[in-house]
Amino acid sequence: MTDTRNGEDNGKLLYCSFCGKSQHEVRKLIAGPSVFICDECVDLCNDIIREEVQEAQAESSGHKLPAPKEIRTILDQYVIGQERAKKVLAVAVYNHYKRLNQRDKKDDIELGKSNILMIGPTGSGKTLLAETLARLLNVPFTIADATTLTEAGYVGEDVENIIQKLLQKCDYDVEKAQMGIVYIDEIDKISRKSDNPSITRDVSGEGVQQALLKLIEGTVASVPPQGGRKHPQQEFLQVDTRNILFICGGAFAGLERVIQNRSARGGIGFNAEVRSQEMGKKVGEAFKEVEPEDLVKFGLIPEFVGRLPVIATLDELDEAALMQILTEPKNALTKQYAKLFEMEGVDLEFRPDALKAVARKALERKTGARGLRSILEGILLDTMYEIPSQQDVSKVVIDESVIDGSSQPLMIYENSEKPAKAAPEA
């Protein structure tokens, strides 16, 4: 092949055989036998080939299902603590996808689907666990908020919208969507308001639970195509939810009291075991004793509880766990902020007493790991505002006094022997 740049071939103007642009409209034109291709079309072809190769590799790697121990090892890299929950999730997810791999083989025994219920305080890692599972298995994943769902025909989101979101994640590939994972958050917020079935419509509570029943158990959902309901003449997509893994999660505030009340009723008479109301001091410890009847007492209907046979309970995060979360995971917050500062050519150092103070503040706010980012964002705001405009800062040090608000981050300059405090923006 010859490389034709700005000259003309025998006095004729040359054109790209693919896009039709002339040699004057592109940077480079490559000549072949009776054809020409420009540099822009070469780049486009490279992108197409790269995407197809990546998809083929992803599909081939998807056939190898990691063992439960391997799944837990990967979860350990992103989620601190919650050892029991990680083991429960690893086994449940492994069995689910093992069941899917066997579904084409003829067998008298049909394996049922085991959806998962995660119970744990706010910021304990429920969403992160579900996200990490989907990422390591390379399957479509979507998050739905149960508080926005209503029964069909009422203002709000229909439960079928969950499947539409899943389809959007995989470019409306129905086959891929049917192997996906759906995480429904705030599931405790759709509990019915009393133990007795309501005679009035509860469109965002018990009504939503009823609507979710078939979807979670397995049904063929009719989902509008990409155009949505604006084009009613288009055929609806039929999505079978039998093989979609549903993970429901919630904080279930107050469930620990239901569990403790049941435990306190241990028995009567001289031989009855005496139990103290103070037994479950920690919410996470109480959650470990949860029974289906407790969830029904809390406000979930029995049929809905029955569709979630695997229960994973998460512990409250203590100060030590929060400090680990700040530094140990692959995507730990301190590593993320250090990377941001590194892009400016500045080192960022967190002293151990600073990490402890951040963990204490998150505990006081009762936000768990979710509150760590907002705390760090607040203390680093002024520094991140100033540093891009300063060329000679080499290091920023954060200690306990910065977290407490009594001083500003310490900024160390390359050409100055005397370190300076970052000045807050007036």
From Swiss-Prot:
GO terms for biological process: cell division; proteolysis involved in protein catabolic process. The keyword Oxidoreductase does not apply. Keywords: ATP-binding, Chaperone, Metal-binding, Nucleotide-binding, Zinc. One of its GO terms (cellular component) is HslUV protease complex. InterPro entries: AAA+_ATPase, ATP-dep_Clp_protease_ClpX, ATPase_AAA_core, Clp_ATPase_C, Clp_protease_ATP-bd_su_ClpX, ClpX_bact, P-loop_NTPase, Znf_CppX_C4. Zn(2+) binds at C16, C19, C38, C41. Residues 4-57 form the ClpX-type ZB domain. GO terms for molecular function: ATP binding; ATP hydrolysis activity; ATP-dependent protein folding chaperone; protein dimerization activity; unfolded protein binding; zinc ion binding. ATP binds at P121, T122, G123, S124, G125, K126, T127, L128. The keyword Glycoprotein does not apply. It holds the Pfam family ClpB_D2-small. HAMAP family: ClpX. Belongs to the ClpX chaperone family. Component of the ClpX-ClpP complex. Forms a hexameric ring that, in the presence of ATP, binds to fourteen ClpP subunits assembled into a disk-like structure with a central cavity, resembling the structure of eukaryotic proteasomes. ATP-dependent specificity component of the Clp protease. It directs the protease to specific substrates. Can perform chaperone functions in the absence of ClpP. This is ATP-dependent Clp protease ATP-binding subunit ClpX. It comes from Pseudomonas aeruginosa (strain ATCC 15692 / DSM 22644 / CIP 104116 / JCM 14847 / LMG 12228 / 1C / PRS 101 / PAO1). The lineage of its organism: Bacteria, Pseudomonadati, Pseudomonadota, Gammaproteobacteria, Pseudomonadales. The gene is clpX.
